Swiss-Prot record:
It comes from Mesocricetus auratus (Golden hamster). This is D-beta-hydroxybutyrate dehydrogenase, mitochondrial. Keywords: Acetylation, Allosteric enzyme, Glycoprotein, Lipid metabolism, Membrane, Mitochondrion, Mitochondrion inner membrane, NAD, Oxidoreductase, Phosphoprotein. The gene is BDH1. The keyword Glycoprotein applies. Substrate binds at S59.
């Protein structure tokens, strides 16, 4: 069995469907709660007593507002790895490449277009182009 959290859309949704098509029993967490609730606590809270291996999906974009929780997944995984090692539980983190289209993250152009004028004044357009 596999637990996949954050299955409302994006990578989690695609991963859950793919694993199901490969014959896995998938527990798909599709809760419309705060991102931190899904990405941090939903990863293992309910299933930890049953697990021998934990594989968390994080993000290479660990420095944007969306990914502050993904960086939290990495820190949480590091702590969990240390704490669960004596019990033989393995903990891994997978950081997929750029899945911006699948995650519905905005392009730099769209972010700039939707910014309030007061924010544009203090953050020039060049600031958003580094996100490419």
């Amino acid at each position: 069995a596999v637990l996949v959290t954050g299955c409302d859309s994006g990578f989690g949704f695609s991963l859950a469907k793919h694993l199901h098509s490969k014959g896995f029993l998938v527990f798909a967490g599709c809760l419309l709660k705060e991102v931190a609730e899904v990405n941090l606590w939903g990863t293992v809270r309910s299933f930890l007593p049953l697990l021998r291996r934990v594989v968390n999906i994080s993000s290479m974009l660990g420095r944007s507002p969306y990914c502050i929780t993904k960086f939290g997944v990495e820190a949480f995984s590091d702590c969990l790895r240390y704490e669960m090692h004596p019990l033989g539980v393995k903990v891994s983190v997978v950081e997929p490449g750029n899945f911006i289209a699948a995650t519905s993250l905005y392009s730099p152009e769209r972010m700039w277009d939707e910014l309030p004028e007061v924010v544009r004044k203090y953050h020039p357009m060049d600031y958003y182009w580094w996100l490419r």
